[in-house]
Amino acid sequence: MNTRPEQASKDTSGLTLQVALQRQDFRLEIDLELAGHGITALFGPSGSGKTTALRVLAGLEPAAQGRVCVQGDMWQDSAQGVFKPVHQRALGYVFQEASLFDHLNVQENLQYGFKRTPASERFRNWDHTLDLLGIAHLLKRWPHELSGGERQRVAIARALAASPRLLLLDEPMAALDAPRKAEILPYLERLQSRLEIPVIYVTHAIDEVARLADQLVLLEAGQVTAHGPTAELLTRLDLPLAHGDSAGAVLHCSVVSHDEADHLTLTRFAGIDLVVPRQNAAVGQTLRVRVAARDASLTLQRQTDTSILNILPASVLALSADGPGQVMVALEVGGSALLARITARSAHTLGLVPGLAVYAQIKGVAILG
């Protein structure tokens, strides 16, 4: 096995996807430049082209026209007659159902992926991969002995064992129940921070997007309707994600201190303090915090006789109708964006207009990781 220290990928120029594919009455058109690391989520309704986009990246749609370049390696350039078939593309592909070899145990499944790559092209450390997915204790087990979450972790590890330059995850949690999703999510979070290759993650679950994705691509009927940082797109009132009961903002907060007596942790984002339930996190560590729009209320004056701990100075950016009698308010707080879903009557009573200074009262937060 390769036990030498893991090396960074040979090129960090990122991923270029400029392609078009016509299928009867459906047309996929994508023009994207993506970062060379981190998780990019493809999000959209069924039939929007998410899985088709992955298939184009993998070389499974030879009819697609355009360019695919991954970390400086041109996989497809139709104008130049370049098209590498799937077996010549250094990628890992994980589907909804973990496709493990039932006649091989976990270690043998991983060795299959490991041996696919010539020794000279291996940069993925074997032990690092086991640690990343937390599967060292599973090596002698057979696929039928694994839970759904364990099977997916092994499938991802097998894909990584081949030292891919790109990892494609096609709704890897769609077939899992809630407990198994909770089991695998912390390991998927590790991919976000510890892999030096781009990860393209297809999902239709907004909670997965909020927790995992650095960048977000919205697809509708084969077209890219928006692309950018996840935190930004989740709070744009011109996009559907910023509306409805599931709307909310994602903040990246640094741990400042812990209050052991009251079981609280003080965090800070953009110079703004945010108190959260006690976290097992080191001072200086960054936490991903989600504030649901339904958990934010607004006042014109700072309240002192309240049980709410987080009362943040804010200014109104924009307002948008959000269902019968409801208004979604976009707020700026220390340069970051928040959402508050309030009644239309409250918005009228407070006289909310863009630029108005208010206080956002945060009733609760969710620590995503």
UniProtKB/Swiss-Prot annotation:
GO MF terms, alphabetically ordered: ABC-type molybdate transporter activity; ATP binding; ATP hydrolysis activity
Keywords associated with the record: ATP-binding, Cell inner membrane, Cell membrane, Membrane, Molybdenum, Nucleotide-binding, Translocase, Transport
Membrane-topology annotation of the record: Peripheral membrane protein
Domain ABC transporter: 3-246
Residues given in the record as ATP binding sites: 44-51
Similarity-based family: Belongs to the ABC transporter superfamily. Molybdate importer (TC 3.A.1.8) family.
Gene behind the chain: modC
PROSITE patterns listed in its UniProt record: ABC_TRANSPORTER_1 (PS00211), ABC_TRANSPORTER_2 (PS50893), MODC (PS51241), MOP (PS51866)
Catalysed reactions, as listed in the record: molybdate(out) + ATP + H2O = molybdate(in) + ADP + phosphate + H(+)
Name under which the protein is recorded: Molybdenum import ATP-binding protein ModC
Protein source organism: Albidiferax ferrireducens (strain ATCC BAA-621 / DSM 15236 / T118)
SUPFAM superfamilies: MOP-like, P-loop containing nucleoside triphosphate hydrolases
